[in-house]
Swiss-Prot record:
This is Cell division protein FtsQ. Residues 68-137 form the POTRA domain. Keywords: Cell cycle, Cell division, Cell membrane, Membrane, Transmembrane, Transmembrane helix. One of its GO terms (biological process) is FtsZ-dependent cytokinesis. Residues 1-43 are cytoplasmic. Belongs to the FtsQ/DivIB family. FtsQ subfamily. The chain crosses the membrane at residues 44-64. It is a single-pass type II membrane protein. It comes from Streptomyces venezuelae (strain ATCC 10712 / CBS 650.69 / DSM 40230 / JCM 4526 / NBRC 13096 / PD 04745). Residues 8-24 have a biased composition (Low complexity). One of its GO terms (cellular component) is cell division site. The lineage of its organism: Bacteria, Bacillati, Actinomycetota, Actinomycetes, Kitasatosporales.
Length: 271
């Protein structure tokens, strides 16, 4: 009877199988790496080179060439100011690459040098221009001082002093020197109150208003054309007071004095 394989023979056979399996797996790994890290082809290299050349050319055109340089500045929107005044304050760097112009810095210079400017948009106008779109402040009240007139805008800002009063802009009179209101509200606070009242006036009444007189927080009087006066009171309920005053002026056109300080109980008197 033939004897079976010994333990040593079994171990040898098993080892041979593992060795054979390992040898079959070994050569495939280098091939896998070669396929994964294959060098790019000629077409890919040419495309990459073309993109780089386009980028470099674009940068040179914007920064290095004379194609896109600032050659002119155009100002629009001025009324009292002149384009030359705005452009002098802007100090746009002529000859500089258009792409490098600091538009925020230009805006800041204009606003600093010209308080009359309420806002300005600085825009690049390719290929050679800078545009300055200006919005000027408009006076709603005038403060007379030393024979000149200080212009006040709708925010209460004093922005300019002029020799001649603009047409149809009422004069502000602050009769508050001896008023107890100054203990609680300073002159600037009363100015804001007067500006608020002026802003509530309908266009037709605003055109007829010659003086806005304020004595205290709750004592604002309007002086209209033809010697008419309006006691407005405080700035509260301004829109309602404006509607009531419009109705009173139509209902009693010959009256000389109007009181809308209490808009639910308005009154008119005189002739």
């Amino acid at each position: 009877m033939a004897a079976g394989p010994t333990t040593a023979e079994k171990s040898g056979a098993s080892g041979a199988k593992r060795s054979s399996k390992g040898s079959s797996d070994g050569p495939s790994r280098p091939g896998t790496r070669n396929r994964k890290f294959r060098m790019p082809g000629t077409r890919a290299l040419l495309i990459t080179l073309g993109v780089l050349l386009l980028v470099a050319g674009g940068l040179w055109a914007l920064y290095g060439s004379t194609w896109f340089r600032v050659e002119r500045v155009k100002t629009s929107g001025t009324s009292v100011l002149t384009p030359r005044e705005v452009e002098a304050a802007a100090a746009v760097p002529l000859g500089a690459p258009l792409v490098t112009v600091d538009t925020d810095a230009i805006e800041a210079r204009i606003r600093k040098e010209l308080p009359r400017v309420d806002s300005v948009d600085v825009v690049r106008s390719w290929p050679h221009g800078i545009g300055l779109k200006v919005t000027e402040r408009k006076p709603v009240l005038l403060i007379e001082k030393g024979g000149k007139f200080i212009e006040v805008d709708a925010t209460g800002m004093r922005f300019a002093t002029v020799d001649t009063a603009p047409r149809n802009v009422p004069r502000l009179v602050l009769d508050s020197a001896s008023s107890p209101s100054l203990r609680r509200f300073d002159a600037d606070r009363l100015l804001q109150e007067a500006v608020g009242v002026r802003g509530e006036l309908p266009a037709e009444i605003a055109r007829d208003t010659r003086v806005v007189r304020i004595t205290s927080y709750d004592s604002v009087t309007l002086e209209l054309t033809r010697g008419r006066t309006v006691f407005w009171g405080s700035g509260e309920h301004g829109a309602v007071k404006a509607r009531v005053l419009t109705a009173l002026l139509k209902a009693t056109p010959k009256a000389g004095h109007f009181d809308v300080s209490a808009p639910t109980a308005p009154a008119s008197s005189g002739s």
